[in-house]
């Protein structure tokens, strides 16, 4: 059995993170010492690592709750359910990547249009393009 600080250290999170997951009903603490300290098991450590890894992959708390539910009661769930949750997250990531690539292209056009000299920025193409909403990036300074 582990106290909250020990569990936090092993899972590389803070005790406040564990308390937060408890409030979100993603972690439970059924055992306490006579002094009122929470005690956790190896199973709690595995659950906490599961949650932490899912958070690192960007899953929402709701998705993690669903995945935990599937993990806790695998006999009443299918792999298709887990895969559906992962596919949804994958689509979100792909959309974000496309958005970032579009942003990168826009920034590259702004960068390429500017001569970057030490002259006054009175006629800076970057500033002009940003003012116009980047609708027409002109070359020059």
From Swiss-Prot:
* One annotated GO molecular function: DNA-binding transcription factor activity
The record's SMART domains line, in alphabetical order, gives: HTH_MERR (SM00422)
For the ligand (Zn(2+)), the binding residues are: 114-115, 119, 124
| Gene Ontology process terms (BP) | DNA-templated transcription; positive regulation of DNA-templated transcription
* Keyword terms: DNA-binding, Metal-binding, Transcription, Transcription regulation, Zinc
Entries under InterPro entries matching the protein: DNA-bd_dom_put_sf, MerR-type_HTH_dom, MerR_fam, ZntR
Q: Which residues form the HTH merR-type domain?
A: 1-70
Task: Look up the DNA-binding region in the UniProt entry and give its residue ranges.
Answer: 4-23
This protein's source sits in the domain of life called Bacteria
Which CDD domains is this protein grouped with? HTH_HMRTR
* Stated role: Zinc-responsive transcriptional regulator of zntA.
Assembly and oligomerization: Homodimer.
Protein's recorded name = HTH-type transcriptional regulator ZntR
Taxonomic classification, please?
Answer: Bacteria, Pseudomonadati, Pseudomonadota, Gammaproteobacteria, Enterobacterales
């Amino acid at each position: 059995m582990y106290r909250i600080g020990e569990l936090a250290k092993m899972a590389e999170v803070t005790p406040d993170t564990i308390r937060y997951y408890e409030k979100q009903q993603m972690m439970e603490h059924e055992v306490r010492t006579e002094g009122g300290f929470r005690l956790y098991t190896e199973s709690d450590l595995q659950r906490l690592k599961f949650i932490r890894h899912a958070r690192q992959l960007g899953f929402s708390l709701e998705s993690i709750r669903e995945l935990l539910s599937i993990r806790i009661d695998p006999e009443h769930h299918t792999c298709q359910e887990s895969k559906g949750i992962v596919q949804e997250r994958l689509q979100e990531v792909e959309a974000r990547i496309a958005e970032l690539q579009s942003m990168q292209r826009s920034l590259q056009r702004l960068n390429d249009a500017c001569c970057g000299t030490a002259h006054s920025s009175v006629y800076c193409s970057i500033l002009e393009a940003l003012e116009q909403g980047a609708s027409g990036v002109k070359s020059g300074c």
